[in-house]
Amino acid sequence: MSMLKRIAAALTALASAAVLGDITGTITTENGMAQKGVIRWSTRDKAYAVAKGNTEIQIKPSEVAEIEIDKPAGYDEAVAQVQKGQGAAAIPALRKIAETYRHLQWDKRAGRYLAEAYLETGKANDGLRACEAVIDDDASAAYMGDLAPAYWRALLALGRKAKLEAQLEKAAKSGDRFSAGAALTMRGDIILKEGAESSDAAKKALTDGYLRVVFLYNDPEIAGRLLPEALYKAAHCFEKLGQSGRADAMRTQIRRDYAASPWAAK
């Protein structure tokens, strides 16, 4: 990112912070000290600043064991809008949160839903830029964590297959089970798109993508984040193959086990 872009991003974040108010949370350092207070990211010093009363301390990223930032106002409402298919209405709030919480945990989470909102409204380029704003600060966000699947969907929508494949390979090797499972779901999406949703493509998407997630990622720690989408997309493929009974079984499992998931509402 150029110096001018960094300055512009910092100024935007400051302006947004004035609207959203102080950002509060707790940073736990590698030596076990918990520093709680008003937290900001210093672009100049490339460090976290924690203000407590009239004092402010700096903590380098290398010293951080865990960071827990309080949820931004309006975040849940904006996410709910995206999940209900009202992405356009959520874009301003999510964009403000992503800018204000740069380096502060919620930039990735808001960036994910911001990208999904743009994709939902047919603005894949804007979705890609929303992801890249976060990835510029943390390259691992391109293949690991909450933002990555939205980034992959933007790349798929724009036909950026070489870049997409590179990120999926990294996800598979990352050691992070969510990312590896999400990469398999994306494999299914790629196969379906390239095969124009033909019967052959549906079969391959099931065996190489969705069903692998269903059977290999059903442990309680990760299933809730991966299975609803994989089950939904597997049901779609079974419908394509004329196997309505198996499709219904997938949908029943979503409604039974993941009733709170937006995929259950679909």
Name each model feature, range by range.
Residues 55-58, 97-109, 135-147, 158, ...:
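Short solvent-exposed coil/turn linkers within tandem alpha-helical repeat scaffolds
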Residues 1-9:
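Bacterial N-terminal signal peptides that target proteins for export
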Residues 90, 127, 164, 202, ...:
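Single-residue signature of alpha-solenoid repeat helices
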Residues 8-17:
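Bacterial N-terminal signal peptides
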